[in-house]
């Protein structure tokens, strides 16, 4: 091979390497650009865009919002803030006395109509769903909030999970949510169709998701799976109902002070129900921390930033995140078992 041929061959190799470097550079620029755009969208959604106007969902026009799990925590706060926006309410929960007290509070303060239904969804009886159907039959419903949910009493290995607890979680989080939506969503479609000719009213279905569904959660395996299921179901429903002018959103939350989380004091990362619901209702239709997900929102700012960081670094399905999650819930389990042992000794 002559010297000139060697130079030509080296030039060809250099062009290949140079081309490869340009491809890598281009991919890097694309990644940085999309990351920057998602971060800007996060900031706009959380802090800069104005609050959503619920007039488009029929606020102050006699329309109804149905809420499950409405007697405590997040559900109770949804009822208060939707009543404040001028919606009549259908409140579905387990405890009659709590529902009656909330009914009186909201009717006195906001002068709205509040209908209540006390049923135990964990029983999964056909009569429960018939009662819901009868109550909602003649009501112009435009909003449904699927809030009812159940978790484990304490973190527990899947192989040690009691069958009753497992069945309750699936029944409440999945079966009941789907069946209630099948009952109420047609009413929303009907109401929106009638109103669209006059005012362009839209419908809205909100379903409570969880970080437990976003990130696989060892020691809460059944709960984690049930919430992950809701992600796929809610996104699919959003695609089906978009043609009917109904917005369907999954709401992702980290910890919130409530009886289910067993956390009493709020903090930077853990809002109270009032703070969480306020951030949710002001951001309906915006992704906030769920920039990579369709028809999904993580509305509370600290939760949103936390999700953004995990998603853009390790990834929600990575081994390291799974391991950290396992260690976190293992420590909670150990503390809970020690507390239970101390209580037994006192007795």
Curated annotation (Swiss-Prot):
Positions annotated as active site in the UniProt record: 223 (proton donor), 227 (lowers pka of active site tyr)
InterPro entries in the cross-refs: 3_ketoreductase_fungal, NAD(P)-bd_dom_sf, Sc_DH/Rdtase_CS, SDR_fam
Enzyme class: oxidoreductase
EC code: 1.1.1.330
Pathway the protein acts in: Lipid metabolism; fatty acid biosynthesis
SUPFAM superfamilies registered for this protein in UniProt: NAD(P)-binding Rossmann-fold domains
Keywords, alphabetical: Endoplasmic reticulum, Fatty acid biosynthesis, Fatty acid metabolism, Lipid biosynthesis, Lipid metabolism, Membrane, NADP, Oxidoreductase, Transmembrane, Transmembrane helix
Subcellular location: Endoplasmic reticulum membrane
Lyase keyword on record: no
Membrane topology: Single-pass membrane protein
Transmembrane regions listed in the UniProt entry: 20-40
A GO term for molecular function: very-long-chain 3-oxoacyl-CoA reductase activity
Catalytic activity reported: a very-long-chain (3R)-3-hydroxyacyl-CoA + NADP(+) = a very-long-chain 3-oxoacyl-CoA + NADPH + H(+); 3-oxooctadecanoyl-CoA + NADPH + H(+) = (3R)-hydroxyoctadecanoyl-CoA + NADP(+); 3-oxoeicosanoyl-CoA + NADPH + H(+) = (3R)-hydroxyeicosanoyl-CoA + NADP(+); 3-oxodocosanoyl-CoA + NADPH + H(+) = (3R)-hydroxydocosanoyl-CoA + NADP(+)
UniProt-annotated binding residues for NADP(+): 120, 147, 223, 227, 256, 258
Pfam families the UniProt entry points to: adh_short
UniProt-listed HAMAP family: 3_ketoreductase
Other noteworthy facts: Present with 41900 molecules/cell in log phase SD medium.
Family, similarity comment: Belongs to the short-chain dehydrogenases/reductases (SDR) family.
Function per UniProt: Component of the microsomal membrane bound fatty acid elongation system, which produces the 26-carbon very long-chain fatty acids (VLCFA) from palmitate. Catalyzes the reduction of the 3-ketoacyl-CoA intermediate that is formed in each cycle of fatty acid elongation. VLCFAs serve as precursors for ceramide and sphingolipids.
Protein name: Very-long-chain 3-oxoacyl-CoA reductase
Organism name: Saccharomyces cerevisiae (strain ATCC 204508 / S288c)
Organism lineage: Eukaryota, Fungi, Dikarya, Ascomycota, Saccharomycotina
Gene: IFA38
């Amino acid at each position: 091979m002559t010297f000139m041929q060697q130079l030509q061959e080296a030039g060809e190799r250099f062009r290949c390497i140079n081309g490869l470097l340009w491809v890598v550079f281009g991919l890097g620029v694309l990644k940085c650009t999309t990351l920057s755009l998602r971060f800007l969208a996060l900031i706009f959604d959380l802090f800069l865009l104005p609050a959503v106007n619920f007039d488009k969902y029929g606020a102050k026009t006699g329309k109804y919002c149905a809420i499950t799990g409405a007697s405590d925590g997040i559900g109770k706060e949804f009822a208060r803030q939707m009543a404040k926006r001028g919606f009549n309410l259908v409140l579905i929960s387990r405890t009659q006395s709590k529902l009656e007290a909330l009914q009186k509070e909201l009717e006195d303060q906001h002068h709205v109509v509040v209908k209540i239904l006390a049923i135990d969804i964990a029983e999964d009886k056909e009569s429960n769903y018939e009662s819901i159907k009868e109550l909602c039959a003649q009501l112009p419903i435009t909003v449904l909030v699927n809030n009812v949910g159940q978790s484990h009493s304490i973190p527990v290995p899947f192989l040690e999970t009691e069958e009753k607890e497992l069945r309750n979680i699936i029944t409440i989080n999945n079966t009941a949510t789907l069946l209630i939506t099948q009952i109420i969503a047609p009413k929303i479609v009907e109401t929106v169709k009638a109103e669209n000719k006059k005012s362009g009213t839209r419908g809205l279905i909100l379903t409570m998701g969880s970080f437990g569904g976003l990130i696989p959660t060892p020691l809460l395996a059944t709960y984690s799976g049930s919430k992950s299921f809701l992600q796929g179901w809610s996104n699919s429903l959003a695609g089906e109902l978009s043609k009917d002018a109904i917005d369907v959103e999954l709401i992702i939350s980290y910890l919130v002070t409530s009886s289910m989380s067993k956390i009493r004091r709020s903090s930077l990362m853990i809002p109270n129900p009032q703070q969480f619901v306020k951030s949710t209702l002001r951001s309906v239709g915006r992704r906030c921390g769920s920039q990579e997900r369709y028809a999904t929102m993580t509305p509370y700012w600290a939760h949103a930033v936390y999700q953004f960081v995990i998603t853009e670094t390790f990834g929600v399905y990575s081994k390291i995140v799974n391991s950290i999650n396992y260690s976190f819930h293992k420590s909670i389990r150990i503390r809970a078992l020690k507390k239970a042992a101390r209580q037994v000794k006192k007795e």
